Amino acid sequence: MNTQQLAKLRYIVPEMRRVRHIHFVGIGGAGMGGIAEVLANEGYQISGSDLAPNPVTQQLTNLGATIYFNHRPENVRDASVVVVSSAISADNPEIVAAHEARIPVIRRAEMLAELMRFRHGIAIAGTHGKTTTTAMVSSIYAEAGLDPTFVNGGLVKAAGVHARLGHGRYLIAEADESDASFLHLQPMVAIVTNIEADHMDTYQGDFENLKQTFINFLHNLPFYGRAVMCVDDPVIRELLPRVGRQITTYGFSEDADVRVEDYQQIGPQGHFTLLRQDKEPLRVTLNAPGRHNALNAAAAVAVATEEGIEDDVILRALESFQGTGRRFDFLGEFPLNPVNGKSGTAMLVDDYGHHPTEVDATIKAARAGWPEKNLVMLFQPHRFTRTRDLYDDFANVLTQVDTLLMLEVYPAGESPIPGADSRSLCRTIRGRGKIDPILVSDPAKVAEMLAPVLTGNDLILVQGAGNIGKIARYLAEIKLKPQTSEDGQHD
């Protein structure tokens, strides 16, 4: 490393400077790629492997990283340390080779903890809302001129990246509870947005285990640190006496320290008042729809207020907030005449939400902002275990749309579970008597099956965490028009 690169490492433990080459297995994931991006910008030699290129790997290649689109033992040659995604199995040939060569193998969160060690860490945890809240906190701190480092699980649209190396002392990071690895983090401030049953295989199916893990995470705060917690969530309210740290609560609840009042949504914007203890009320215009995003903003404001950031800076950042990739992501509005011969248009929105609570929040935001629209959802269930465990919740939530098209379950490496498939879920929803779902067994036929159900005054929600985001972008690319054999088909 040259002198300029070493100067960037002022927030790194001195011994970490002995590390030269960091290899990431599963580098194409947003969380992994974000950490790799920060380390690349700090001057480390970065390599990594994944199965296929994507925007994350392209960005890292642009920064000088070496990316392999395979998993081979020789990929870890000369690495000082190997960082692994929780999605990677222990028998991966690169992990096996690293162990044989006595190269340290660590999880993503351990490397994130190293980045946070000598910085003022702000960690955002919770079942839902982490990515957007992380982006909001980052936006406010950037607007205040504090030049934070951030590592997010989704694309921060204003920056065009998942992660950025700043020169300030703040590190703002999404904290992942899916594999309990957030216990490696020792932040100064921790936000917990909500706690619901998800990733229960990590917690042996025991919700009490999940709750205790969140408490353990908060106990990583120093006694002078602060927990910022959504008191609207009944589980969080139950856990407050066990936190044992300074707490700021937020929510719509009357007893919240930072309280959301008078919420109104007009199109894609939320308008509301934030009441804070011993502070002037803030009248907020938030450039993100839905009551759930008002809560995310309240969490960000609670942290920023505690830091002493001026109100006018906070308001500017929230009004100009550009959102995150695949979170109520507006992809365009398209005329329907070329699609199905009808007059009028259809709006196309892409959203990552894949838990019933998240899907419900997206539907409510769509209904509140565009109440007159025909609401069409293209949904892809994510994981057979989640579909099984939350089956009735999915069936209840998905009946709220006007038209539902459902893709097959995205397995994410899981084996099928009888009765936890899309055909069964469609049958159950049909039995409720409200809507008649359409099963889309062939993703190449999405546009063909979508066109006939569009009326000319539609809002299409493309919803899910699997590969459905690619389908959303494809629909935008073809402007919803079904492709003939001459046009070519989406694979």
Swiss-Prot record:
GO cellular component, one term: cytoplasm
UniProt KW ATP-binding keyword: yes
Subcellular location as annotated: Cytoplasm
Pathway the protein contributes to: Cell wall biogenesis; peptidoglycan biosynthesis
Domain of life: Bacteria
NCBIfam families the record matches: murC
Record-linked HAMAP family: MurC
Protein name as it appears in the record: UDP-N-acetylmuramate--L-alanine ligase
Species whose genome carries this gene: Escherichia fergusonii (strain ATCC 35469 / DSM 13698 / CCUG 18766 / IAM 14443 / JCM 21226 / LMG 7866 / NBRC 102419 / NCTC 12128 / CDC 0568-73)
